[in-house]
Amino acid sequence: MISINIVGEVDSILIESILELDRRITINSSNIDPNFIIVYEKFDEYYTFLKEFIGKIPIVIITGNTSYSRKCYFYSLGIDLYIIKNNESKSLILCRILNEIKKYIKYVNDDFIDFENHQFVFNNYLVNLSNIELKILRCLYINLGRYVSKEELKKGVWDTEDFVDSNTINVYIHRLRDSLKNCKEIEIINERKLGYKILIRKDLC
């Protein structure tokens, strides 16, 4: 799942165009943490909100604030795209936003898991994994943006809830994290009682 949040002005044409890009995309879901944020602002009303997410996930700002120093400041923080509304047409703004989303989708496609050769490939980073580790990785990926419980992993990886205890899952998650430790763009986090979640960070591998 690719969760995109649109903050501020909501453009129906933009929403339709985004949803056409990939069937996995959801917009403004209350159940999934965002993987990508688009902010429409008049001047500076989302400054605090933006600082919380910049550098963690891709962010696009479309603003009426014409300050060049502010634009430079946000790029220095790691913003992905900063568009001043008055400088560009609506159609061009739409194209630029969609192109940025396409770049992100490229990072989260299924192609990085090669079951036949037991390999994981991401941004030129390659590691050999066991079949179980690959299945866990894929199970976390297809649920991108939300926690996957141990019960879900048992069903998705082992196709059973029997004969697989929590310790077995913990061991495989530990091995998977250890195998991926050199790829800083991929992180597996866990939350007590919720399960495990995969984070894909941009431009770090």
From Swiss-Prot:
Gene3D superfamilies per UniProt: Winged helix-like DNA-binding domain superfamily/Winged helix DNA-binding domain
Report keywords, A-Z: DNA-binding, Plasmid, Transcription, Transcription regulation
DNA-binding recorded as keyword:
yes
- The superkingdom of the source organism is Bacteria
| The keyword Transcription is assigned to this record | yes
Q: Which GO terms describe its biological process?
A: phosphorelay signal transduction system; regulation of DNA-templated transcription
The family database entries (PROSITE patterns) matched by this protein are listed as: OMPR_PHOB (PS51755)
Q: Which InterPro entries match?
A: OmpR/PhoB-type_DNA-bd, Sig_transdc_resp-reg_C-effctor, WH-like_DNA-bd_sf
Q: Which residues mediate DNA binding here? A: 103-200
- Name one molecular function that GO assigns to this entry: DNA binding
Annotated Pfam families: Trans_reg_C
Which family is annotated?
To the C-terminus of E.coli phosphate regulon transcriptional regulatory protein PhoB.
| Descriptive protein name | Putative epidermin response regulator
What species is this protein from? Staphylococcus epidermidis
Q: Which gene encodes it?
A: epiQ
